[in-house]
Amino acid sequence: MATSNPHESKVWLAAYAPGVPSEIDEVVETLPDMIEASVKTHGKAPALEFFGAVTSYRDLGDQIERAAEGLCRLGVVAGDRVALILPNCPQHVVAFYAVLRLGAIVVEHNPLYTPRELRHQFEDHEARFAIVWDKVYDVVDDFPQDVRPEQIVAVDMTEAFPWSKRVALRLPVAKARAARAKLTAKPRAKHPVSWASLVEGRRLPRRTPRPSVDDIALLQYTSGTTGSPKGAILTHGNLRANAMQGRAWVPGLREGEETFYGVLPLFHAYGMTLCLTFAMSIGARVVLFPTFDVSLVSDAAKKSPPTFLPAVPPIYDQLSRASAQGSIDLTSVRFAISGAMSLPVATVERWEEATGGLLVEGYGMTETSPVALGNPIGPSRRPGTVGVPFPSTEIRVVDPEDPSVDVEPGEPGELLIRGPQVFQGYWRRPGESADSLLEGGWVRSGDIVTVAPDGFVTIVDRLKELIITGGFNVSPTEVEETLQQHPDVADAAVVALPRRDGGEIVAAAVVLRPGATIDVTTLRDFCRTRLAAYKVPKRVFVVEDLPRSLIGKVLRREVRTRLLGEA
């Protein structure tokens, strides 16, 4: 074992693209400071585009101030947690920055979560206020009294559509009714607080106290390295630092001229940082999509061609196929950054042939706001690796059994990360915080890596037993507990199996109770009522028993080996 950190010399700096600094400046502004600077500098420029409707930075700033005042009238004060349960839409962006302007804390949620999943998170963070898509209003309204927020604001995202599209949705025809049902719903409550009423008042008084860089900005729920969902605490300084690191990483960005495509969900740390903070810090136009759809992207590209597209490999593959078929022109895309799951070299080749631009892989985790490493934007990038540490970011590679001990150069070990983007711990989880956040500010990644002599990092294994599917983390334990609730299931183990495109699927091995029989489709339907769709096992195998250790723990690696033999 090494006696000290072999990576202190930062040999990877030689691989940085020209103009990329080794360090970023000290963070001195909060996220509200950042967006206000963009409003001042790029006031007339487009900030958001949604189904063709464009919002300028000046109008965005005005809406943020009015929404902040509306939230203040509802009783939101600094330090309050405010839950957001919204798809990608302009109201999501406004709500995010309005909450932060008051010094309150944003808590992001997946609007496609089941009531059970949402309730678990609300029980943990105890938000007094929620701003929710009107289609999930009733879910939150039905929470037990001790969990339900005091105030729930209903958002009809179709109010942000252009006039012509709103009119089309009101047509008394089946197609319009079906489209409307997917996008909006009327809450059962007689007089819910509407988003429109929240933003129709005056602007927030300038004297209203402002948050500081060290204040908590966000609770972002993650399975972490242990599989149990918990809120990662991220400050204004953490999130602003990561936006600054992203800006420094990409040479040739044109302030006020780039067009980012928001195909990633803003409730995910990756989509949030790339499109809500990084993009808006440079005055970019952010084209928002409530869900990824090739035809929607194709239509938008005809009016506002994308120049910067953060996404995940399955999205790049779908768009590359569409380009090859002639249904979309991607040649405007200069920069594409992939994350959240491994990036196959074949995906890179197809994408770069379709666009003429670069597709590079980055690496991070919710606990690092989320980006910590990336491939250089230039000839020194290396497909198949996750690149090198970002500016102001340090790494260690340690013995996973004793993270105080560094491994020898080139040997595999657990990746540790330190930098201004590293989180502050988990909400109300001191034990798990201490396990993940080590002395000196190092965060454990749970990933086993090797580091090449020139500093490029390759992931070779995963300590944490999370499954990454479509860019989302799935806790095997959560899925196993759901399966075990079925009356015919005696035991279950959940693992990842490989997909042909290099990604992973959720697979389950189940042991039935004596005399029981079960239809796999029925079991998956059972899960679908309790879990978000991406967590539902794609493959289910009925087995006689599960391999266990001497102390009775299921050996998931052995389960995976068995299933690979049967798949």
Predicted regions and their residues:
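AMP-dependent adenylate-forming
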Residues: 7-13, 18, 33-56, 74
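Conserved AMP-binding/adenylate-forming core of the ANL superfamily
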Residues: 25-27, 44-89, 93-97, 114-119
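Conserved adenylate-forming
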Residues: 71-76, 202-214, 219-262, 282-284
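Structural core segment of the AMP-binding/adenylate-forming
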Residues: 73-74, 101-197, 514
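AMP-binding/adenylate-forming catalytic core of the ANL superfamily
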Residues: 113, 120, 130-132, 419, ...
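Conserved AMP-binding/adenylation subdomain of ANL enzymes
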Residues: 240-259, 267-308, 322-323
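Gly/Ser/Thr-rich phosphate-binding loop
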Residues: 306-311, 320-381, 394, 404
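Conserved ATP/PPi-binding loop(s) of AMP-dependent carboxylate-activating enzymes
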Residues: 388-392, 403-436, 474
